[in-house]
Protein backbone atom coordinates (compact mmCIF):
# COMPACT_ATOMS: atom_id res chain seq x y z
CA UNK A 1 0.00 0.00 0.00
CA UNK A 2 2.82 2.38 0.84
CA UNK A 3 4.31 1.74 -2.61
CA UNK A 4 1.14 2.91 -4.41
CA UNK A 5 -0.41 5.67 -2.29
CA UNK A 6 0.74 9.30 -2.33
CA UNK A 7 3.30 9.64 0.52
CA UNK A 8 1.98 13.08 1.49
CA UNK A 9 -1.66 11.97 1.75
CA UNK A 10 -0.78 8.84 3.74
CA UNK A 11 1.06 10.89 6.38
CA UNK A 12 -1.35 13.83 6.74
CA UNK A 13 -1.57 14.81 10.39
CA UNK A 14 1.37 12.54 11.29
CA UNK A 15 4.48 13.96 9.62
CA UNK A 16 3.01 16.18 6.88
CA UNK A 17 0.61 19.13 6.99
CA UNK A 18 -2.26 20.16 4.73
CA UNK A 19 -1.45 22.44 1.79
CA UNK A 20 -4.83 24.18 2.00
CA UNK A 21 -5.85 25.80 5.30
CA UNK A 22 -9.53 26.74 5.42
CA UNK A 23 -12.95 25.54 6.58
CA UNK A 24 -16.23 25.63 4.64
CA UNK A 25 -19.66 24.00 4.76
CA UNK A 26 -21.69 24.79 1.65
CA UNK A 27 -18.83 26.31 -0.38
CA UNK A 28 -16.48 23.35 0.11
CA UNK A 29 -16.61 22.10 -3.51
CA UNK A 30 -16.19 25.64 -4.87
CA UNK A 31 -13.11 26.23 -2.71
CA UNK A 32 -11.52 22.92 -3.76
CA UNK A 33 -12.07 23.74 -7.45
CA UNK A 34 -10.69 27.25 -6.85
CA UNK A 35 -7.55 25.85 -5.19
CA UNK A 36 -6.96 23.57 -8.19
CA UNK A 37 -7.34 26.53 -10.58
CA UNK A 38 -4.88 28.62 -8.51
CA UNK A 39 -2.26 25.84 -8.53
CA UNK A 40 -2.72 25.18 -12.26
CA UNK A 41 -2.38 28.88 -13.04
CA UNK A 42 0.86 29.17 -11.04
CA UNK A 43 2.41 25.93 -12.34
CA UNK A 44 1.70 26.75 -16.01
CA UNK A 45 2.41 30.48 -15.85
CA UNK A 46 5.60 30.13 -13.78
CA UNK A 47 7.04 26.90 -15.16
CA UNK A 48 10.56 28.40 -15.34
CA UNK A 49 10.48 29.71 -11.76
CA UNK A 50 10.88 26.27 -10.16
CA UNK A 51 7.69 26.18 -8.08
CA UNK A 52 8.25 23.66 -5.28
CA UNK A 53 5.01 24.12 -3.34
CA UNK A 54 1.89 26.32 -3.10
CA UNK A 55 0.12 26.73 0.27
CA UNK A 56 -3.31 28.40 0.32
CA UNK A 57 -4.95 29.88 3.42
CA UNK A 58 -8.44 31.44 3.43
CA UNK A 59 -10.37 33.77 5.70
CA UNK A 60 -13.84 35.24 5.14
CA UNK A 61 -12.80 37.95 2.68
CA UNK A 62 -9.13 37.24 2.02
CA UNK A 63 -6.93 34.58 0.40
CA UNK A 64 -3.26 34.13 1.28
CA UNK A 65 -1.05 32.28 -1.22
CA UNK A 66 2.47 31.17 -0.21
CA UNK A 67 4.66 30.34 -3.22
CA UNK A 68 7.79 28.30 -2.44
CA UNK A 69 10.14 28.80 -5.38
CA UNK A 70 13.76 28.14 -6.31
CA UNK A 71 13.99 31.37 -8.35
CA UNK A 72 12.11 34.15 -6.52
CA UNK A 73 13.48 36.79 -8.90
CA UNK A 74 11.39 35.38 -11.76
CA UNK A 75 8.22 35.41 -9.64
CA UNK A 76 8.81 38.95 -8.32
CA UNK A 77 9.92 40.43 -11.65
CA UNK A 78 11.50 43.83 -12.22
CA UNK A 79 10.43 46.16 -9.38
CA UNK A 80 7.70 43.69 -8.39
CA UNK A 81 5.84 43.95 -11.72
CA UNK A 82 5.40 40.19 -12.16
CA UNK A 83 4.21 39.72 -8.55
CA UNK A 84 1.61 42.48 -9.04
CA UNK A 85 0.39 40.83 -12.25
CA UNK A 86 0.04 37.46 -10.51
CA UNK A 87 -1.83 39.08 -7.62
CA UNK A 88 -4.28 40.78 -10.00
CA UNK A 89 -4.92 37.53 -11.89
CA UNK A 90 -5.54 35.64 -8.64
CA UNK A 91 -7.92 38.34 -7.38
CA UNK A 92 -9.81 38.10 -10.67
CA UNK A 93 -9.95 34.30 -10.31
CA UNK A 94 -11.06 34.24 -6.65
CA UNK A 95 -13.04 37.48 -6.43
CA UNK A 96 -11.34 38.28 -3.11
CA UNK A 97 -8.34 40.22 -1.85
CA UNK A 98 -5.16 38.15 -2.32
CA UNK A 99 -2.02 38.36 -0.16
CA UNK A 100 0.96 36.92 -2.04
CA UNK A 101 4.01 35.61 -0.14
CA UNK A 102 7.06 34.52 -2.14
CA UNK A 103 9.42 32.22 -0.22
CA UNK A 104 12.79 31.01 -1.49
CA UNK A 105 13.72 27.32 -1.33
CA UNK A 106 17.30 27.28 -0.05
CA UNK A 107 18.24 23.64 -0.68
CA UNK A 108 17.17 22.74 -4.22
CA UNK A 109 18.81 19.28 -4.31
CA UNK A 110 16.84 18.10 -1.23
CA UNK A 111 13.40 19.08 -2.61
CA UNK A 112 11.68 16.22 -4.47
CA UNK A 113 9.52 18.46 -6.67
CA UNK A 114 12.50 20.53 -7.84
CA UNK A 115 14.61 17.41 -8.44
CA UNK A 116 11.82 15.91 -10.58
CA UNK A 117 11.48 19.17 -12.51
CA UNK A 118 15.25 19.31 -13.08
CA UNK A 119 15.31 15.75 -14.48
CA UNK A 120 12.31 16.49 -16.73
CA UNK A 121 13.94 19.65 -18.10
CA UNK A 122 17.10 17.68 -18.92
CA UNK A 123 15.05 15.01 -20.70
CA UNK A 124 13.30 17.73 -22.73
CA UNK A 125 16.76 19.01 -23.74
CA UNK A 126 17.69 15.50 -24.99
CA UNK A 127 20.05 14.60 -22.15
CA UNK A 128 20.40 10.82 -21.67
CA UNK A 129 17.87 9.71 -19.04
CA UNK A 130 20.33 7.53 -17.09
CA UNK A 131 22.80 10.38 -16.87
CA UNK A 132 20.10 12.81 -15.66
CA UNK A 133 18.80 10.36 -13.04
CA UNK A 134 22.24 9.46 -11.65
CA UNK A 135 23.33 13.08 -11.51
CA UNK A 136 20.19 14.00 -9.53
CA UNK A 137 20.74 11.10 -7.11
CA UNK A 138 24.39 12.04 -6.52
CA UNK A 139 23.52 15.71 -5.90
CA UNK A 140 20.73 14.78 -3.47
CA UNK A 141 22.83 12.30 -1.47
CA UNK A 142 25.46 15.00 -0.86
CA UNK A 143 22.92 16.92 1.25
CA UNK A 144 23.19 16.28 5.02
CA UNK A 145 19.44 15.80 5.62
CA UNK A 146 18.91 13.32 2.75
CA UNK A 147 19.13 9.66 3.82
CA UNK A 148 17.74 8.04 0.68
CA UNK A 149 16.28 8.79 -2.74
CA UNK A 150 14.32 6.87 -5.38
CA UNK A 151 13.80 8.12 -8.96
CA UNK A 152 11.44 6.58 -11.53
CA UNK A 153 11.17 7.59 -15.21
CA UNK A 154 8.45 6.12 -17.42
CA UNK A 155 7.75 6.57 -21.14
CA UNK A 156 9.54 6.21 -24.47
CA UNK A 157 12.98 6.51 -22.91
CA UNK A 158 15.70 7.30 -25.42
CA UNK A 159 13.11 7.40 -28.22
CA UNK A 160 12.43 3.64 -27.99
CA UNK A 161 9.46 2.16 -29.86
CA UNK A 162 8.00 0.61 -26.71
CA UNK A 163 7.59 2.57 -23.49
CA UNK A 164 9.20 1.23 -20.32
CA UNK A 165 9.99 2.20 -16.74
CA UNK A 166 13.49 2.73 -15.29
CA UNK A 167 14.14 2.92 -11.54
CA UNK A 168 17.22 4.02 -9.60
CA UNK A 169 17.61 4.41 -5.86
CA UNK A 170 20.26 4.97 -3.23
CA UNK A 171 20.01 4.78 0.55
CA UNK A 172 16.78 3.98 2.45
CA UNK A 173 13.28 5.04 1.36
CA UNK A 174 10.84 3.41 3.88
CA UNK A 175 7.46 4.13 2.25
CA UNK A 176 5.50 2.00 4.77
CA UNK A 177 6.89 3.78 7.86
CA UNK A 178 4.40 6.48 8.85
CA UNK A 179 6.84 8.41 11.03
CA UNK A 180 9.28 8.67 8.10
CA UNK A 181 9.53 12.12 6.49
CA UNK A 182 9.12 11.36 2.78
CA UNK A 183 9.22 14.20 0.26
CA UNK A 184 7.51 13.35 -3.05
CA UNK A 185 7.42 15.17 -6.39
CA UNK A 186 6.27 14.52 -9.95
CA UNK A 187 6.80 16.25 -13.29
CA UNK A 188 6.28 15.56 -17.00
CA UNK A 189 8.91 15.98 -19.70
CA UNK A 190 7.54 16.88 -23.14
CA UNK A 191 9.81 15.38 -25.81
CA UNK A 192 9.50 14.81 -29.57
CA UNK A 193 8.68 11.14 -28.83
CA UNK A 194 5.92 11.96 -26.33
CA UNK A 195 5.62 12.54 -22.61
CA UNK A 196 7.99 11.05 -20.04
CA UNK A 197 6.80 10.95 -16.43
CA UNK A 198 9.29 11.55 -13.61
CA UNK A 199 8.66 10.63 -9.95
CA UNK A 200 11.02 11.32 -7.04
CA UNK A 201 10.88 10.13 -3.42
CA UNK A 202 13.36 11.60 -0.88
CA UNK A 203 13.71 10.23 2.66
CA UNK A 204 14.85 12.83 5.22
CA UNK A 205 14.75 10.84 8.45
CA UNK A 206 12.02 10.22 11.02
CA UNK A 207 9.75 12.60 12.93
CA UNK A 208 9.89 11.73 16.65
CA UNK A 209 7.99 13.73 19.26
CA UNK A 210 7.17 16.48 16.76
CA UNK A 211 10.87 17.04 15.98
CA UNK A 212 12.09 16.40 12.45
CA UNK A 213 15.36 14.52 12.14
CA UNK A 214 16.17 16.50 8.98
CA UNK A 215 16.09 19.78 10.94
CA UNK A 216 18.37 18.35 13.64
CA UNK A 217 20.90 16.97 11.12
CA UNK A 218 20.85 19.94 8.73
CA UNK A 219 23.64 22.02 10.40
CA UNK A 220 25.88 19.02 11.04
CA UNK A 221 28.40 17.93 8.46
CA UNK A 222 27.45 14.88 6.41
CA UNK A 223 29.49 11.74 6.91
CA UNK A 224 31.69 11.71 3.86
CA UNK A 225 35.23 10.97 2.91
CA UNK A 226 36.47 13.41 5.52
CA UNK A 227 39.85 15.06 5.77
CA UNK A 228 42.61 13.15 3.99
CA UNK A 229 45.14 14.07 6.67
CA UNK A 230 42.90 12.71 9.43
CA UNK A 231 42.69 9.23 7.85
CA UNK A 232 45.42 6.61 8.30
CA UNK A 233 47.38 6.15 5.09
CA UNK A 234 47.96 2.82 3.41
CA UNK A 235 50.77 0.87 4.99
CA UNK A 236 50.63 2.97 8.15
CA UNK A 237 50.29 -0.07 10.44
CA UNK A 238 53.17 -1.86 8.72
CA UNK A 239 55.44 1.15 9.21
CA UNK A 240 54.58 1.26 12.93
CA UNK A 241 55.40 -2.46 13.31
CA UNK A 242 58.72 -2.02 11.45
CA UNK A 243 59.68 0.90 13.69
CA UNK A 244 58.81 -1.13 16.82
CA UNK A 245 61.01 -4.03 15.62
CA UNK A 246 63.95 -1.68 15.02
CA UNK A 247 63.57 -0.20 18.51
CA UNK A 248 63.38 -3.69 20.01
Swiss-Prot record:
- SUPFAM superfamilies noted in UniProt: Prokaryotic type KH domain (KH-domain type II) (SSF54814), Ribosomal protein S3 C-terminal domain (SSF54821)
Q: Which residues form the KH type-2 domain?
A: 38-106
List the Pfam families hit by this protein, alphabetically: KH_2, Ribosomal_S3_C
Q: Which UniProt keywords apply?
A: Ribonucleoprotein, Ribosomal protein, RNA-binding, rRNA-binding
Annotated Gene Ontology MF terms?
mRNA binding; rRNA binding; structural constituent of ribosome
User: In which residue ranges is the amino acid composition biased (Basic and acidic residues)?
Assistant: 213-230
Renumbered to this chain, region (Disordered) spans: 213-248
Top-level taxon? Bacteria
Q: Which pairs are disulfide-linked?
A: none
Cross-referenced InterPro entries: KH_dom (IPR004087), KH_dom-like_a/b (IPR015946), KH_dom_type_2 (IPR004044), KH_sf_prok-type (IPR009019), Ribosomal_S3_C_sf (IPR036419), Ribosomal_uS3_bac-typ (IPR005704), Ribosomal_uS3_C (IPR001351), Ribosomal_uS3_CS (IPR018280)
Q: Name one GO cellular component term.
A: cytosolic small ribosomal subunit
Any one Gene Ontology BP term: translation
Subunit notes for this chain? Part of the 30S ribosomal subunit. Forms a tight complex with proteins S10 and S14.
Its biological function? Binds the lower part of the 30S subunit head. Binds mRNA in the 70S ribosome, positioning it for translation.
Name the family: Belongs to the universal ribosomal protein uS3 family.
Q: Which HAMAP family match?
A: Ribosomal_uS3_B (MF_01309_B)
Specify the protein name: Small ribosomal subunit protein uS3
Q: Which gene encodes it?
A: rpsC
